[in-house]
Amino acid sequence: MKTEITWHGHAGFSIKNGISILVDPFFSGNPLAKADAEDVKADLILVTHGHFDHAGDAVKIAKNNQSPIVCSFELSEIIKKEQVETIDTNPGGTIEYKGVRATAVPAIHSSSYFSFHKYLIPISYKIFIFSYTFIILL
């Protein structure tokens, strides 16, 4: 199956490979984003940490798509108050959702609202690493 990756500016990406995965959905107020948060489709949303420029539109998109947000336990406790499904994990933890496996890995970043981590997502023998450096190993 073909994998399609779209950069949404800043740290935001979509990965489509039979399922639509959205990472760090920051659309509103992002001059580099070419889409509006209201129009974004996602089956699964991954948020690396609680800064507005990473978590910005996660709740809005999750509600529009009835999709869960994968994030740290601490951030999950806040997001749940918005009546959105969350899947919490911490560094080293792996979640599985509709055939997608994402593993949270520790990452260093200044002053995050709550803990932060990046995700390894193996898709068809490809590994995608989302961090402040975007690395795709094929």
Region annotations inferred by a language model:
Residues 43, 67-74:
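Short internal beta-strands
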Residues 12-51, 56-63, 111-120:
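Pre-active-site segment of Zn-dependent metallo-hydrolases
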Residues 15-18, 97-98, 127-130, 138:
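Active-site beta-strand termini and strand-to-loop segments that position acidic
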Residues 1-3, 16-21, 94-102:
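Beta-strand-turn-beta hairpins that frame and shape the catalytic cleft
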Residues 9-11, 71-77, 91:
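Short, polar loop motifs at secondary-structure junctions
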Residues 104-138:
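Active-site-proximal loop/helix segment associated with metal-binding centers of metalloenzymes
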Residues 4, 63-68:
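Short active-site oxyanion
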Residues 68, 80-94:
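Binuclear metal-ion centers of metallo-dependent hydrolases, dominated by the metallo-beta-lactamase
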